[in-house]
Amino acid sequence: MDERRLIRVSKYLSKHLRHQPERLGLTLEPGGWVGVEQLLAACAANNVAISLAELHEVVEQNNKQRFGFDPTGQKIRAHQGHSVTVDLGLVAQQPPIILYHGTAKHNLAIILRDGLRPMQRQHVHLSRDRATALQVGARHGQAVILIVQADELFQAGQAFFCSDNGVWLTTAIDPAYLALER
């Protein structure tokens, strides 16, 4: 599959596995899972033909590893980023001392005043490395990187989760735990 098709299919899956499963007539199971055959049939019924081989390619080749199959290969889900309520079954764990959050420069003043909020998602997304944060922030304009004092937040009682693709998740972050990387 060429790169453009890979991106289009990935975006289509993101939309329907993270935000609007009902638009395809899908109901996410606990953990955010949906049957592979059910997903492919729903896509086809909505005039979007995706083959099983293409689905596997998107899961394997997506640079952010947004999706994963269950151990049987019969179900698929988005690893994180849901705006619909989904319990991914992640276990709270101690985060690294610091994590990073990339954002566009035009968001900076509000974030430094109000902190990081999940917005339309269930969680704030954090990266273990600054390169990933920079890539995320650059999607919406000139990127800036915020350093998150994750261990301090954890010690203060805030829960952190690490998704299957290595993205750290938490609830809102007070600005006192944020610093602009210079």
From Swiss-Prot:
EC assignment: 2.7.1.-
Keyword NAD: yes
Gene3D superfamilies: 3.20.170.30, RNA 2'-phosphotransferase, Tpt1/KptA family, N-terminal domain
GO molecular function (one): tRNA 2'-phosphotransferase activity
Lineage top rank: taxon: Bacteria
Keywords: NAD, Transferase
A biological-process GO annotation: tRNA splicing, via endonucleolytic cleavage and ligation
A Pfam family: PTS_2-RNA
Family named by the database record: Belongs to the KptA/TPT1 family.
Function, as annotated: Removes the 2'-phosphate from RNA via an intermediate in which the phosphate is ADP-ribosylated by NAD followed by a presumed transesterification to release the RNA and generate ADP-ribose 1''-2''-cyclic phosphate (APPR>P). May function as an ADP-ribosylase.
Descriptive protein name: Probable RNA 2'-phosphotransferase
Organism: Herpetosiphon aurantiacus (strain ATCC 23779 / DSM 785 / 114-95)
